[in-house]
Swiss-Prot record:
Keywords of the record: Acyltransferase, Transferase
Keyword Transferase: yes
Name of the protein in its database record: N-acetyltransferase 9-like protein
EC number(s) recorded for this UniProt protein: 2.3.1.-
Family membership: Belongs to the acetyltransferase family. GNAT subfamily.
GO molecular function terms noted in the UniProt entry: N-acetyltransferase activity
Organism: Caenorhabditis briggsae
Top-rank taxon, per record: Eukaryota
Keyword Acyltransferase: yes
High-level lineage: Eukaryota, Metazoa, Ecdysozoa, Nematoda, Chromadorea
N-acetyltransferase domain segment(s): 34-178
Length: 198
């Protein structure tokens, strides 16, 4: 998260800010929900473990984590809706040297669902990584029974299915290069503003 530690992105429907210690307690409450853990493939952690996880993410060079906030005024922790993450790794194809960004998004607060906020948050993190980190390949792994996420990535964002793991009951999708250039390549400047996060 060192990569985005001072980045704040303000867009039409949401604001993205780095995951800070002040966010951990609310994040931990979300992760106490068994359904959220199931859909995100997360383990239950104690509050202390959650603080340690936030600290480790903060120091990692291969993770981008933003907390998704509503655009309304008020205390930041009261505006929290979810998070959006990007895990950066080398391509599994030995002939390719490029980095791949694996995207994850969670809109934990019911008041933030069904409004296009998840779609905007994913578009913002992909656009930011494309422009600032030169990542040109993006993928997502979604459990087969997570219909909202499958719809978001496939129908709304244009990801294409590339594989299925029967062991994990998980579908892997990738974002086609032409979609990245045509939509995400220009999304950030047109629909948002990047500020310094303090």
């Amino acid at each position: 998260m060192k990569l985005n530690e001072n980045v704040k992105i303000v867009a039409e429907k949401c604001v993205l800010v780095p995951y800070e210690p002040c966010h951990v307690e609310k994040y931990h409450k979300w992760m106490e929900d068994e359904e959220i853990r199931r859909l995100t493939g997360s383990e239950r952690l104690s509050l202390e473990e959650e603080f340690e996880m936030q600290k480790s993410w903060r120091e990692d060079d291969d993770k981008l984590t933003f907390i998704v906030l509503s655009r309304e005024e008020g205390e930041e922790t009261n505006r929290m809706l979810g998070d959006v993450n990007l895990f950066i790794s080398k391509s599994e194809n030995l002939e390719e040297e490029e980095d791949v960004g694996e995207v994850e998004v969670m809109i934990a607060e019911p008041r933030g669902r069904g409004k296009g906020i998840g779609q905007e948050a994913v578009s913002l993190i992909i656009s930011w990584a494309f422009k600032n980190l030169q990542i040109a390949r993006f993928c997502v792994k979604i459990t087969e029974d997570n219909a909202p996420s499958l719809s978001l990535f496939e129908k709304k964002l244009g990801f294409k299915r590339v594989s299925y793991s029967s062991a994990f009951k998980e579908i892997t999708m990738e974002l086609p290069g032409e979609r990245l250039e045509s939509h995400f390549g220009r999304f950030l400047g047109e629909n948002s503003q990047i500020l310094e996060h303090k």
